[in-house]
Amino acid sequence: MHNLNIVLVEPQIPQNTGNISRTCAVTGAKLHLVKPLGFEISDKHLKRAGLDYWDKLDISYYDSLDDFFEKNPDGNFFYFTTKGKNVHSEADYPDNSYLVFGREDAGLPEDLLYRNSGNCVRIPMRNELRSLNLSNSVAIAVYEVLRQWDYPDLAREGKLTKYKW
């Protein structure tokens, strides 16, 4: 049994969090939201982006980053940042991995990154551009981990509605 955890630190845009919620629901990843959030959980954009998957989502809320770390002391943490020295696909993700992402407008605190430099990873992109969208970054990261784990508990084949393969 593999446990994959997605951590959003102070997310600001409800549509991003809704999209990420949907990604977590369809992959079985647990979502951790660290407050303060830039929106209300009842936000219509958040709900719409997550579609009707909210009842399939395992989600936890934390009052602060300190609260999160106190309640999850035994995780294997990977910090996704444009400032990372390591490429995300070159890391080995063990069971109980936590993929940690910062605010859309500011990323993760630099003191946190500095203290955990060996676990800071970057999704490669052009240097002259600032960053990828948060929900896209999470999807890239989640599927890299799941690829390394050989897609546990995920359907590998789809079905046509009118025809058979």
Residue ranges and their predicted role:
Residues 1-165:
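Post-transcriptional modification and biogenesis factors for structured RNAs
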